[in-house]
Curated annotation (Swiss-Prot):
Gene designation: atpF
Main location: membrane
InterPro entries: ATP_synth_B-like_membr_sf, ATP_synth_b/b'su_bac/chlpt, ATP_synth_F0_bsu_bac, ATP_synthase_B_chain
TM region positions: 5-25
Subcellular location: Cell inner membrane
CDD domains to which the protein is assigned, alphabetical: ATP-synt_Fo_b (cd06503)
Name recorded for this polypeptide: ATP synthase subunit b
Amino acid sequence: MDINLTLIVQMLVFAAFVLFTMKLVWPPLAKALEERQDKIADGLAAAERGRKELELAQHRVKDELKQAKAHSADIIDKANKRASEIIEAAKEAAKREAQIQAKLAQEQIAQQVNHAKEELRKQVAKLAITGAEKILMREVDAKANSELLDNLIEEI
């Protein structure tokens, strides 16, 4: 292989091409590669942030769900307690009403008994007066008076 002028010119052209490429072509390519690398890194970082935010959101949802369940259980317990209180109050009111009705019934019974006693007294007094009239109209006879009193006692 001979080293001649063509080989030297080709080396100079190649060196000029390398310089031209290093000065004008390589920096935009390197910049584009770096931008692409940054863009991919940003995308990966954003994906990681999104994954972490998703995990946090899932934890918050679980916590809020637990709180909602606890709150609903508390509301149900309060409602059951209130229902029990209402039932107890209704039972007490019914018991008081029953006592009042029983007392009124006893008072009515006592009034009816007193009325019956009064009527009985009136009838006894009437019978006594009638018996006394019969005794006075008849002759005074111990045996007859005794029989009249026995009859009077039987009527009473």
